[in-house]
Amino acid sequence: MRAVIVAVGVAFLVSLFCTPIAIRVFTRLKAGQPIRAEGPVMHQGKKGTPTMGGVVFILATVIAYVAGHLALTTLPDAQIAQVEPTITALVLLGLMVFSGAVGFIDDFLKVRKRHSGGLNKRGKLLGQILVGAVFGVIALYFPSTMTDAQGTLTNTETVGSTTLSFIRDIPALELTKVGAVVLFIFVVMAATNGVNLTDGLDGLATGASVMVLAAYALIAFWQYRHWCADPNYTQDYCYSVRDPLEIALIAGAAAGACVGFLWWNTSPARIFMGDTGALGLGGLIAGMAMSTRTILLLPIIGGLFVIITMSVVIQIISFRTTGKRVFRMSPLQHHFELAGWSEVNIVVRFWIIAGIGVAIALGLFYSEFLASVG
């Protein structure tokens, strides 16, 4: 727990104090956000606001992980507190960094062209598929080599699983490794695009991501306290995951980094996360779902992202089939803007929806544990 607290604190402070530096640097470089002409009229006043702020909280998360991981060396149980970084950490941070890199290319092209059209859809899609495939393979083909004091292998879990999972793996829904990689690519694409579509109002995606990441920190830490690699727990209700403390540490670090960034990103935003931040957060959240064996729980934890994504899907299907639009504008937050809601009201109310999804998911997670124990 100390390591997680260290990671959260370091991430928050790095993000809080480095974001103003990023604002000055990006302003000097004229890295301002272009605004779509067809978007809400009230957004034109945001034109030129520094973007690519996701670089800050991605960097803060990595730095905080290093600090938190070093704190693990003070724990008495060297079996769990390995000094070297785990593959789990490399997969999760890799997903965040390289998904963010795809977004950075998109942001860079937007700034360079002075136009809201950056990386084309095919290029962005290819980048997401490549990131998902590479880290999906790593997650599924590299089992743990953790040993106990007698040199006996105690946990042979991979970061990911070939079994579809809700709160735990579901044995009846076993996939091939190729099928599992394809599933993971889909989850990465869904999560990155979900966060990206949500990132349309000041602080909206950042605040929602804080809740989702905090939920995963709690889930992973609970799994660590009831881990199958711990001989004090029986196989009936322990969790078969790999490196849950590392997962909790990274989730907590990312949540803390987002809180620090939110200080500057809340309305009126002085900086935007850009696709750099949105895709980076989406990649990390996808990795959290995979590594904690909660893939089918993700649509509930990230319920706001699902609702906003579905509003876009519904709008497209409706317009193409009937020629009519269901919403004034999609994604959903812009519909309410055009309906006369203030930006702050929309953000706070959508945060409430995000919080409800997180609360339901945590309730289901804990209820399943109680049912297993009972």
From Swiss-Prot:
- Known Pfam families for this protein? Glycos_transf_4, MraY_sig1
Pathway stated in the Swiss-Prot or TrEMBL entry: Cell wall biogenesis; peptidoglycan biosynthesis
Q: Where is the protein found, in the record's own terms? A: Cell membrane
Query: GO BP, one example?
Result: peptidoglycan biosynthetic process
Q: Does the keyword Cell membrane apply?
A: yes
Q: Where exactly are the transmembrane stretches of this chain? A: 3-23, 52-72, 85-105, 125-145, 170-190, 201-221, 244-264, 271-291, 294-314, 350-370
Name the Enzyme Commission number(s) assigned to this protein. Answer: 2.7.8.13
Reaction catalysed by this enzyme = UDP-N-acetyl-alpha-D-muramoyl-L-alanyl-gamma-D-glutamyl-meso-2,6-diaminopimeloyl-D-alanyl-D-alanine + di-trans,octa-cis-undecaprenyl phosphate = di-trans,octa-cis-undecaprenyl diphospho-N-acetyl-alpha-D-muramoyl-L-alanyl-D-glutamyl-meso-2,6-diaminopimeloyl-D-alanyl-D-alanine + UMP
Going by the UniProt record, its keywords in alphabetical order are: Cell cycle, Cell division, Cell membrane, Cell shape, Cell wall biogenesis/degradation, Magnesium, Membrane, Metal-binding, Peptidoglycan synthesis, Transferase, Transmembrane, Transmembrane helix
Q: Which GO terms of the molecular function aspect are on file?
A: metal ion binding; phospho-N-acetylmuramoyl-pentapeptide-transferase activity; UDP-N-acetylmuramoyl-L-alanyl-D-glutamyl-meso-2,6-diaminopimelyl-D-alanyl-D-alanine:undecaprenyl-phosphate transferase activity
Q: Which domain of life does this protein belong to?
A: Bacteria
Q: What is its main location?
A: membrane
What's its membrane topology?
Answer: Multi-pass membrane protein
Names of required cofactors = Mg(2+)
- GO terms for cellular component: plasma membrane
Top-tier EC class: transferase
Q: What does this protein do?
A: Catalyzes the initial step of the lipid cycle reactions in the biosynthesis of the cell wall peptidoglycan: transfers peptidoglycan precursor phospho-MurNAc-pentapeptide from UDP-MurNAc-pentapeptide onto the lipid carrier undecaprenyl phosphate, yielding undecaprenyl-pyrophosphoryl-MurNAc-pentapeptide, known as lipid I.
Query: Which family does the UniProt entry place this protein in?
Result: Belongs to the glycosyltransferase 4 family. MraY subfamily.
This chain belongs to the protein called Phospho-N-acetylmuramoyl-pentapeptide-transferase
User: Which species is listed as the source?
Assistant: Salinispora arenicola (strain CNS-205)
Q: Lineage of this protein's species?
A: Bacteria, Bacillati, Actinomycetota, Actinomycetes, Micromonosporales
